[in-house]
Every structure is written in C-alpha cells, then in structure tokens.
Amino acid sequence: MAVPLTGSDRLFLGALGTAGDHRLHIALAARLPGPAPTSGELRRLAADSAARAPVLTYRLARGRWAPDPAFDPAHHVVEYRVAPGRDVCAAVVDAVRDNRLRPERPLWSLMAVHGYAEDEHVLCYRVHHAFQDGVGAARIAVRAVLLGRSVPAPDPTVAVRTPVRARMRLLSTGARLAAPSARLRPPPGTAGEAQPGARTFFLRLDVAAVHGIAAATGASVPQVGLAVLAGALRAWNPSRWRKAGRRGTTVSFPLNLNGRLRDGGLGNGTTTMPVVLPCAEPAPRERLRRVMEQTSVGRMAAYRRDRYPVKAPAAVFRLLRWLVSRAFLGRLTVSVIGVSLPLDGCFAVPPTYDTGGGVVSIVHSGTTVVASCVFSAAIAHADRLPGLMEQALDELRREVAR
C-alpha cells in the first residue's frame, strides 16, 4: 500500500537534492571480525533483511512511497575492496560516494567494505536521507540486518495533517535556526585552496570518560556530547567567546518521531530542536548544566508533539522550504544515536551535502562513542575540532571528578 511523503521527505528530495544525490546519503557502519561475506552470502543477507523489514521494498513512485513490484535484493548489495592499510572510515566514505543509488529502486544498499585488514571487514547499511532518517536507518541496520529481528510494515494511516498551531511553531523553529546566532564562528584565517565540497573526520571518544560523566551528573550521553562540542567550539575560536555573556551557537538537534508520524522506518520522520551551545561559558560543568536544561525530557517531548512537518498547505510548505534553505547555510547540525550492539566499532557516515556549515553525528553503545564530523571545505581550521573535542571531554571529566 502506498505511503504519502512527509514534509521532511519532500524537503530532502526537493529543496536539498535528488534521489540520486550521494551527498544526501547516510550510513551506519559496523566493524566486524573475520573475512567479508561472499557475494552469495551478502545477497542472502539483503533478501532476509527485506523479508524481515518490508520498508526495504518501498521506492519512490508518483510522489509517494510504494512497494517495488520488481524488487530484487541483488540490486542492493555492494562489494567494495580497498588497498591493505587503508583507513577504514575513509574507505566507507569512499564506498558511499562511489556507488550511487538508483532513484527508480528502493533507496538503500548493503555494502561490504574489505581489504584494509586481513581479519576484519565492515558491513555498512546506506540509505538516502529522505528514505530514512538516522534513527530509522540505525533501527533497520541493527534489528533487521545485524540482529535478524522483524520490523513492522510501514503504516500509511499514521501520517496526519498538522494543526495550524504546530505549523506556526515549526516556522518559528526554522526562523531561530536561520538567525545569525546559529552561524558557525570559525577562527580567523582561510581554508586555503581547498576544492568545494565537504571534509569528513572521525573521532573515537573515551567511552569510560563519557559514561563516567553521565553517571556522576545524571546527564545522558547526548547531553555530554553537546557539552563537549560546546567546549571544543569555545577553544576553536577563543577570541570570539572571551567576552562574557555573549550568546552561544545555536545548533539544530534532530528528534526522531518514530511512532508519531509512522512506524516501519519509512521516510525522514524527524523534527528539529534548537539548542544553544554555551560556548561563552568558561566552566565545563556549567556548560553541561545549561545543555541539560535545554534538552530535558519535557522540552524534547513538546517538540515531538507539536513541531513536526507532515502535511501542510502549499504556502506554508513554500515558506518552510525557504527557511530551511537558510537554516542550513553555515550552520551546525548535531545528532546522537544509541545502538544496542555488543560491537566495538559502530560509526555513522553523515550526509556530505556542503551547506557551508557542518554535521556532527555521534553513535554510542556500551563499548564505544564515535563522532563523525563533516565540515564544509570553506571553513578554516575545521580539522582542529576533533582534537579539541577530546580536550573538552578531558576538561569536563576532570572538573566532574573534583
């Protein structure tokens, strides 16, 4: 049965790109021990995953999501071999970039990246950002692909027309994210002669430090991650934040609406919540407290309840699309996803669509916390941010331990 597009689906397919645009592809990758699966094993895994998760058979058809009558799991597997010693994260980014999705088919693929080491390979689930948001993609990758569990079929009746009040609040959110206070403030300098595009960095954070801070303060892992990023941005451009009382950097913090819009993991079921990172605050623990205040369960529930883009009149949608096109320019989006896997190496590949800003996507489990960072090539000294995040985490850990 066909499922209508949500407002987010339409934005990602219309205002930001097309179904075949690899810059809007996202992925969840898992480093696994042993040799890569054979071609036959990979095809069987794709077929079994589609049987467990019917969403994997849906494609774009006449402005809706609909089951593909010619679905063939063999069209959704990719074997990508790299040279020995190749950096594993860079290899996965290359695999996503070099293997485009076909817009006439369901917008996903299962990729086996191997060759970089004799005793390890990567299994990567890649989708278009309109087909699934980060949480939806992680849910399918973990449940259907890696754990072999079933996922309900998409429900076409869940997505309903938004009330007028919700539309106005959503427009207000877009205006906040398009405001000057949301623009990234890099340190003085130039990005050199870098070509247009985006640069990707990966950072494995000290999981013991993250979990220790969370246990000692009552914070969640996402809250710790946001506070660490605030400290890194402060150290990145200290002259900007030396003045006390200066307003911080407003970032877009996506919230998944699974169950609110539809079940089954189909479409981009997210809204976004503005969070002001207190970069001007010199005390690490106070930065964490301010982040916790803005990301309370109550505030997130309110955004999930009444600020979601499903169906709206054409005029409202055009205004929202205009705001979104400005809300991403030079801005920062921060997402945090938890996965329940006993693996020591899960990480995300965020979209590489260059908006002049950046994306930080943190994937955490009981054993690892990995930050995947994508920044515009136009931003000076972006390569310093991963190291500054490590320093900010250590500063927060030491202050909490006092």
Where are the language model's segments positioned?
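Soluble acyl-CoA-dependent acyltransferase catalytic core bearing the H(X)4D motif
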Residues: 1-9, 23, 29-51, 58-355, ...
